[in-house]
Curated annotation (Swiss-Prot):
This is Truncated K3L homolog. It comes from the Viruses. It comes from Monkeypox virus. The gene is OPG041. InterPro entries: K3-like_poxvir, NA-bd_OB-fold. Coiled coil: none annotated.
Length: 43
């Protein structure tokens, strides 16, 4: 499990979450937003 801390570019808030893998896909789970799992994509 990989933990991360991401600073939003347009706000002073820092988002903390967890990155996990399921069926060869990386997902992000945000601790402050429990229903907001997202697929991790490189932009």
């Amino acid at each position: 499990m990989l933990a991360f801390c991401y600073s939003l570019p347009n706000a002073g808030d820092v988002i903390k979450g967890r990155v996990y893998e399921n069926d060869y896909t990386l997902y992000i789970y945000l601790f402050d937003y429990p229903h907001s799992e997202a697929i991790l994509a490189e932009c």
